[in-house]
Amino acid sequence: DRSPSRGLGDVYKRQVYIIETKHEKDTNALETVRTLFANKTRDFITAVDEKSIILVKEVKGNESYDELDKTADVIIDMLSTEAMSAAHVAYGTIVNDIREVSRSYKEAKMALDVGKIFYSNKNVVAYNRLGIGRLIYQLPIPLCQMFIKEIFEGKAPDDFDDETLSTINKFFENSLNVSETSRQLYIHRNTLVYRLDKLQKSTGLDLRVFDDAITFKIALMVVKYMKYMESKDTF
């Protein structure tokens, strides 16, 4: 019976990674991770459920979060090549005390969830870099519903057609730059202006105005969060 606290002295900094594999009961993945850290006697690795592996890793005094990112990248690369397994890795903050390891684990778990909702294109998600996604994740659902109702007066942002949504997302990606957005969408500048005007008429929000853009961006994230929570409740 190996528990995370056994054999882990109190003088080392640590931090928790959660590695979630695409397939359930992926024994190859667990073995690959164990092999990767085989010579690290102070690191602890275990499978917690069908798809998740936990790595409690010793952190050297001078190791930065950038280096922890690199470790996560190495894990993903190894799983991809050695175990033929796609994975997501999330990690918590560095803790100074063995009693705080559970906090780093909870942070990693939250990072995994927040990553699925808002940053699905990222394979590595760090708790301390979750940004606004972490804030939204901690909002009560009734508050989210009220916010969406107030902003859109009954018309949810995901009711927009694909063309409108891709225009909005591209506009945000390009920091509200009309010329660059129209170039990347292969449309005339006037076409983009027309779409933004149309959106303004239907929502009352002008995405060319910074405050309105922020409101809209947050609203889209809130809707993503609500949908994710809904899908969790249906299982």
What are these regions (language model features)?
Residues D1-Y12:
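Single conserved hydrophobic/aromatic residue that forms the stacking wall/gate
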